[in-house]
Amino acid sequence: MSEPMKPMEIEQRSFEIITELLGDRVLDPENELVIKRVIHTTADFDYADNLTFSDHAVRKGIAALKGGCDIVTDTQMAKAGINKTILTRLGGEVHCFMSDPDVAQEAKSSGVTRAFVSMEKAAALEKPCIFAIGNAPTALLSLEQLMEERKATPALIIGVPVGFVNVEISKERIIEKARAPYIVARGRKGGSNVAAAICNALLYQIKR
């Protein structure tokens, strides 16, 4: 009976299989590790086609992380999935304000969504931030509105909300307006796990 594979061996073999299954497909070298990390997380090769990157988005995201920026997510799941060991070493931390009592109260009293208030709260942070949105298209639309009003200047937008209502519109608006560097999963696919995977793909490149 052969010895069980160690976690790192499993991951290495998984990436070898991904490379094999991509075949002759040529990926942009700057974006390749992000795309493969998302495929590894989801087992979905559609991400080789639907992940869209603004010019040098990966490079800019890595530079922001090296500079100690924070990461803002729209779910606790995405927050939990991000490698905090590397992020903390770089001087950053992860925030998710969606379930904060003050956010809920402000949303109720103002008649707006918690997503908008949470993005507004994040925009008020003193440090540069990467916004990793994997669940709520309203958070992405709110962030775009705040950028239009010059109240938010993201270091990078990871726009990968999943679903059917306002999802594609929110993503396309980020791409069309291009007010900040972005990594967007076009179409309906995405999720908190995808948002976390993209953050980790950037962090792991710094680790190396």
Summary of predicted features, one role per range:
Residues 26-40:
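N-terminal glycine-rich anion-binding loops that anchor highly charged ligand groups
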Residues 78-81, 138-143, 164-168, 191-195:
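Short glycine/serine/threonine-rich phosphate/pyrophosphate-binding segments
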Residues 74, 157-159, 198:
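Buried hydrophobic positions in well-ordered alpha/beta secondary-structure cores of metabolic enzymes
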